[in-house]
């Protein structure tokens, strides 16, 4: 169960719930992110289209995403709606929920290594990482990319740094994205081969110097065509590096009297 940061949800908040009991007039749910707090789903908030029975829509044990529509703070009563949740909201919330569960399992493993409880781990490092990166799993992904620096920046106590680093690298994988295309570099000069090499090296160096996260491959597919492949953790980094490399490559080519063009592959 995800760690509870506050006692009650806010009106308008999307929450993950487990259906507990279903009656003709509505259903009772437990809110997974709020320590099993009970919520009521009125029959009128079950579906936007006509359905014969509430039992056709929700069943005991089912995991659903609902929107909070009323909160009585004094009585700690919460009413929710299923019909006001769009498909995209449901998918996004369930993804966030699964990411939170995975992140907390990793945090629990680290806590066990240090002889701490999950609650102690959350107080010591979880809150800091959430406050700094917005989400625990987002913090862990940043650690995969940047290493222990990402933990220290968020104020993680030193005793937690190495255990966190070990478990994060063991359990979290950040997918890399790719851009590819073909450079056409041609020279009819007597020393054309050397001129072409200089242009290609300019492009490759510009990419490698733009970010340590980028992996670059540049190889011939049959002169004067050369395949360029860039790989990193996000497209923004790649686009910036590619634009700079092509600009520098074109300038070098122009100064050497070399034909230069780039055709990008569709993704």
From Swiss-Prot:
Name listed for the protein in its UniProt record: Translation initiation factor 2 subunit alpha
Biological role stated in the UniProt entry: eIF-2 functions in the early steps of protein synthesis by forming a ternary complex with GTP and initiator tRNA.
Quaternary context: Heterotrimer composed of an alpha, a beta and a gamma chain.
Native species: Hyperthermus butylicus (strain DSM 5456 / JCM 9403 / PLM1-5)
Family matches, as SUPFAM superfamilies: eIF-2-alpha, C-terminal domain (SSF110993), eIF2alpha middle domain-like (SSF116742), Nucleic acid-binding proteins (SSF50249)
InterPro entries: NA-bd_OB-fold, S1_domain, S1_IF2_alpha, TIF2_asu_arc, TIF2_asu_C, TIF2_asu_middle_sf, TIF_2_asu
UniProt family annotation: Belongs to the eIF-2-alpha family.
One example GO MF annotation: translation initiation factor activity
Protein encoded by which gene: eif2a
Residue ranges annotated for the S1 motif domain, each copy included: 12-83
Keywords, in A-Z order: Initiation factor, Protein biosynthesis, RNA-binding
Top-level lineage group: Archaea
């Amino acid at each position: 169960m995800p760690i509870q940061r506050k006692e009650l949800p806010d009106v308008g908040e999307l929450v993950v719930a487990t259906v507990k009991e279903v009656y003709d007039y509505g259903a009772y749910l437990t809110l997974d992110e709020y320590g099993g707090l009970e919520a009521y789903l009125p029959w009128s908030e079950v579906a936007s289209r006509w359905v014969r029975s509430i039992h056709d829509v929700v069943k005991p044990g089912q995991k659903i995403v609902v929107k909070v529509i009323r909160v009585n703070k004094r009585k700690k009563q919460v009413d929710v709606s299923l019909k006001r949740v769009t498909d995209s909201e449901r998918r996004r919330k369930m993804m966030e929920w699964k990411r939170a569960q995975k992140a907390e399992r990793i945090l629990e493993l680290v806590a066990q290594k240090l002889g701490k409880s999950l609650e102690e781990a959350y107080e010591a490092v979880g809150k800091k990482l959430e406050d700094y990166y917005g989400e625990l799993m987002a913090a862990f992904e940043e650690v995969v990319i940047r290493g222990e620096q990402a933990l220290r920046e968020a104020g993680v106590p030193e005793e937690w740094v190495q255990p966190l680093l070990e478990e994060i690298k063991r359990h979290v994988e950040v997918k890399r994205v790719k851009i590819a295309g073909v450079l056409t570099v041609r020279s009819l000069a007597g020393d054309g081969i050397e001129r072409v090499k200089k242009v290609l090296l300019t492009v490759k160096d510009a990419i490698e110097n733009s970010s340590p996260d980028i992996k670059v491959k540049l190889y011939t597919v049959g002169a004067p065509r050369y395949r360029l492949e860039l790989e990193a953790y996000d497209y923004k980094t790649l686009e910036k590096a590619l634009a700079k490399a092509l600009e520098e490559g074109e300038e070098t080519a122009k100064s050497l009297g070399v034909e230069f063009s780039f055709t990008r592959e569709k993704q």
